[in-house]
Amino acid sequence: MHKDGRWAREILQLQKPEGHWGYFHTLSETKKFPVTTEQALRRLEILGYTLEDEPIARAVVYMLDCLEHRREIPDRREKLHDWDVFTDLMLAAWIRRFTGDCPAANRVAERWAGVITKTFATGEYDSAAYIRSYENTFGLKPAGGRLTDFVSFYQISLLIDALDEKTERAMVTYVLNHEAGIYNLYEKILNRLPESFASREANRYLSAVELLAEYRSGRESLHFVADWLEEQQNDRGIAGL
């Protein structure tokens, strides 16, 4: 894979002038929109695209317009979620993948950081504290799987560099031991290595681990993964964490 390769060109050809790729999140109408905006952003990020690249800069401007309600993402409102809270969460998380200098996205991160700080105030996850803090922050009780359980790609990505050391360490420990893994990335416990390295499951596992490794305390907790990668390195030439 290469930044100027075929895969990148195919994705960039699908980008709309406004900066999006069609639906932001919804996996439907694939003939109309072959890729969602977040799928395109994830692939371009993997290929090494940054805010300095015009397609990403244009996408970030679009997402900021949506976050500040000058535009709306075209996805159908999902009734099973707190849609407005969820939309702000998605947009802010993706903006912060590419820049930490967006006040609107950082405000969303600060609100979620407040929720998570109260959730882990005792050093361990407190479900009642999470629900109470969420309701106090957002004005309603959490609804929908991605919000009643905060361990999804969006929250974990959004909160990088947003938590104090004590809260971060407690949260990382909780996520590593979370039986359902990280929603949207790898939905098995992260403290258990995949059975096969050469598998799609291992690829998904490494995506989740790489996200968690972006936390200061994440790398300290992931030595067992680094050891596993080192075992594979001689035969496969895989770089460690």
Briefly describe each language-model feature range.
Residues 1-241:
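Preference for long, amphipathic alpha-helical scaffolds in soluble/luminal domains
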